[in-house]
Amino acid sequence: MNTATTTDNNAVRKHDVRKELFVDGYEVVIGIEIHCQLNTESKIFSSAPTDFGHEPNSQASIVDLGLPGVLPVLNAGVVDRALKFGIGVNAELGLFNTFDRKNYFYPDLPKGYQITQMANPIVGEGYIDVVVNEGEKNEYPKRMGITRAHLEEDAGKSVHDAVDGMTGVDLNRAGTPLIEIVSEPDMRSAHEALAYIKAIHQLVTWLGISDAIMAEGSFRCDCNVSIRKPGAELGTRTELKNLNSFRFIERAINREIERQIDILEDGGKVVQATMLYDPERDETRVMRTKEDANDYRYFPDPDLLPVRIEQHTVDSIRAAMPELPVARRARFEEALGLSEYDARILTGSRQIADYFENVVAEVGQADAKMAANWVMGDLLGALNKDDKEITDSPISAKQLAGMLSRIKDDTLSGKLAKKVFSALYEREGGDADDAADKIIEEKGLKQETDTGAIKAIVEDVIAKNAAMVEEYRGGKEKAFNGLVGQVMKASRGSANPQQVNQILKELLG
């Protein structure tokens, strides 16, 4: 077996696999298997909880442990979530689906088999549209095929060096519901693979069927990678296992492409194997030779009846489906006049999109761009700085809309609005919808719009800054900005900037 690895430091040949779809004369072929935990409160075949982070082996029931005499009972919520996903990827739905046993031995698989769907999956062929290199000059759309998606139970987890250098087994995860999403081998680069994975990740969180927290293992990716000369038969594939970071996914695929090219260019043969990516050494290496499906001896599970889904159930789920990201993004551009960039940011998650639309519902569609600027720039910026999600925002959509309304009616200038926003973020106005009004009143942040009052301040500034006035009259435009700054300083930022500019120009001639 050739177990050669390739890193940036020790590669004999360097291959630029970042952008090209053909690398050193080879075509890259990638297929993805995604294991996504479904967010039910109990497991797929037992009543045990699915909470993350508890003491090892504290959330495994007798069903999960495979003790004699127990029988699995299918969780109906798992079926509903799988149907949502199938509808979301435009797939054929398996209204008749069955469960099978996948037989293999591993310490974290207590029954000696995994319950899965081999013969009749709940989701058949579908597709998802993605944008590769999104936001970059070389972005392009592509439709990625989905072969199938099936339900199965998760295995436990081996915990290495848990006790005195030994490996322990934590079965809390055993029996957690999974939907395994199998793509067509449609990806031709790491960029395309990453775009597909991100699109699936966004979809499952958008639909509310999974939290998809990669760091907790609830969204894991296996990448099947092969290379071939254009027009040749598919090459031998290797499987990069359990990748749980967007950054590592792209790097791992590129390193595996390099490794396979090196093997073939040296006259060797790629061996079908399961690969590990080592991020510290930035290399892939063989974990074990890859099993074929026959090695698992699949057969129907005798303890679980076939699942028959009525069409009215599908119709009910379809009717309750939310507007999907692509459609919502298009509507933001067409109906609200937002740029492609703004629409993409504001549909980054369903929660962000909902928040934004709630603000627009209060201020009106005509001011959607102003709402977008405040949500994207100020609010998301503050939340990102504090490592918070939009659901943790200390400013409600109605509170932000209330502040924007005061900008619209000239109660607030842009500068004063920043102060009000900061106070809202610190919850100084409380939980009431009119918190912005309370802050404006308590802090005296109302914009001065009385022409007479502003004119008096301007006249005083002109009198005290004769040199700057002469510079302006001598043709130095920067001096005018200096005078505006002096007026704003004298008014403590409360004077209406437009009125200040107008009055200054009138008095200076």
UniProtKB/Swiss-Prot annotation:
HAMAP family: GatB (MF_00121). Allows the formation of correctly charged Asn-tRNA(Asn) or Gln-tRNA(Gln) through the transamidation of misacylated Asp-tRNA(Asn) or Glu-tRNA(Gln) in organisms which lack either or both of asparaginyl-tRNA or glutaminyl-tRNA synthetases. The reaction takes place in the presence of glutamine and ATP through an activated phospho-Asp-tRNA(Asn) or phospho-Glu-tRNA(Gln). It comes from the Bacteria. GO terms for molecular function: asparaginyl-tRNA synthase (glutamine-hydrolyzing) activity; ATP binding; glutaminyl-tRNA synthase (glutamine-hydrolyzing) activity. Signal peptide: none annotated. It catalyses: L-glutamyl-tRNA(Gln) + L-glutamine + ATP + H2O = L-glutaminyl-tRNA(Gln) + L-glutamate + ADP + phosphate + H(+); L-aspartyl-tRNA(Asn) + L-glutamine + ATP + H2O = L-asparaginyl-tRNA(Asn) + L-glutamate + ADP + phosphate + 2 H(+). GO terms for biological process: glutaminyl-tRNAGln biosynthesis via transamidation; translation. Heterotrimer of A, B and C subunits. Its EC number is 6.3.5.-. This is Aspartyl/glutamyl-tRNA(Asn/Gln) amidotransferase subunit B. PROSITE patterns: GATB (PS01234). SUPFAM superfamilies: GatB/YqeY motif (SSF89095), Glutamine synthetase/guanido kinase (SSF55931). It comes from Psychrobacter cryohalolentis (strain ATCC BAA-1226 / DSM 17306 / VKM B-2378 / K5). PANTHER family: GLUTAMYL-TRNA GLN AMIDOTRANSFERASE SUBUNIT B MITOCHONDRIAL AND PROKARYOTIC PET112-RELATED, GLUTAMYL-TRNA(GLN) AMIDOTRANSFERASE SUBUNIT B, MITOCHONDRIAL. Keywords: ATP-binding, Ligase, Nucleotide-binding, Protein biosynthesis. It is an enzyme of class 6 (ligase). Belongs to the GatB/GatE family. GatB subfamily. InterPro entries: Asn/Gln-tRNA_amidoTrfase_suB/E, Asn/Gln-tRNA_Trfase_suB/E_cat, Asn/Gln_amidotransferase, Asn/Gln_tRNA_amidoTrase-B-like, GatB, GatB_C_1, GatB_Yqey_C_2, Gln-tRNA_amidoTrfase_suB_CS.
